[in-house]
Amino acid sequence: MGKYFGTDGFRGEANVTLTVDHAFKVGRFLGWYYGKNHENGKAKIVIGKDTRRSSYMFEYSLVAGLTASGADAYLLHVTTTPSVSYVARTEDFDCGIMISASHNPFYDNGIKLINAAGEKMKEDVIAEIEKYLDGELGEIPYATRENIGCTVDYTAGRNRYMGYLMSLAIYSFKGIRVGLDASNGSAWTLAKAVFDALGAKTYVINAAPDGTNINANCGSTHIEVLQDLVRREHLDVGFAFDGDADRCLCVDEKGEVITGDHILYIYGCYMKDRDKLVGNKVVTTVMSNFGLYKAFDAVGIEYEKTKVGDKYVYECMSENGYRIGGEQSGHIIFSKYATTGDGIITALKMMEVMLAKKKTLSELAAPLVIYPQVLKNIRVTDKTQAQDDADVKAAVEAVANALGADGRILVRESGTEPVVRVMVEAGSTEECEKYVDQVIDVIKSKGYAV
């Protein structure tokens, strides 16, 4: 993780942490860097954005930087992160840029960089961008006259992505009542258009973005809103997306939440039944619920655990050829169809399993028993020092020994904040609370808490 770019791009409060000057310079660098690969010096870069008020401001700044360095900028306008990835990897683009802070509040924003393969940008390129932002690379020449880049409205790319999504459905959705929570974000028109075209009866909420209501008490981080809709309208299933629609959580016909762990279990079993689960493995992160692994053990599915972050999940999948992986939060990667988490593809695949198995989502998820989990964050002066402290480690080991085979404890640093996260899974919420507080009390007693 660098000074500016974290595990999911350059993210922070608009014009405080991430400024228009930063965006302009990122554009300047990318236009120059990729232009060197072309005889005419002209790179071709595609840009998407979410519905935040500041996304337009950052789009203009990036375009100014790109075209000033001689690159052509292709604008998908409001779209999803996975659509930028799809367009970048299926057309002749040098890279893609998504302007979004994902599930964060409207006043934050971010710049996500995607390479020509549709993957998150490699660390060596990010390192060079950081050097340029810090003034270590000197001046980049400005393009002049006919060498100044062009700006192209490229809604055709977004439409092609929508067609691709529809091509993935192997069953008609006719007669199925589906709830969609668009989080007032990138999926606000796209998700409904896809499900309507496939024949579903859609009930859409939080699809009226105004620049400040993205993720505001809605979407995958406020799943209770969709739960209420599913119960009130007696729907068959519901899907909730986050601000840039790279994640999806589900609600079954009873109004109960289906997490990313449930999705991994349901699709992993579906693939195993069809002898298509490569390596007989599903990729998870260390934050997946203890119950998921017990459920996998019961059906003979093996698993890999990575660090938290869909970037690490994808790297493991890519290196080993695995087909399914993801996070509890709903970042699910179907590597046959995408190189990133894609909330709409996740929803389509859950529909496919329901229709193929002729079962409800609650029936498909039933064998997975989720263990009670308590996760608490503590702000600290130095997250690495706090986590590595000998007394803190001893407290963690004591909890692990007390839990034995009936639970687990995980202590880790946040990738984006000065925070240590303490998580316990056990037989009861009370037991989880007790053990989490034990560790946090030690962190506080050692003077690390802010």
Give each language-model segment a name.
Residues 1-64, 68-69, 151-178, 384-385:
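An N-terminal, well-structured beta->alpha segment
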Residues 5-6, 47, 73-78, 98-99, ...:
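General beta-strand structural signal in soluble alpha/beta enzymes
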Residues 127-162, 167, 253-326, 332-334:
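Proline/glycine-rich low-complexity loops and linkers
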Residues 237, 274-450:
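Phosphate-binding and adjacent anionic-ligand microenvironments
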Residues 44-108, 193-251:
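N-terminal small/polar loop signature for handling phosphorylated ligands or for N-terminal nucleophile
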Residues 48-50, 180-182, 252, 336, ...:
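Short glycine-centered, acidic/aromatic-flanked micro-motifs in structured strand/loop junctions
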Residues 13, 109-233:
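Gly/Ser/Thr-enriched, mixed-charge loops and adjacent short helices
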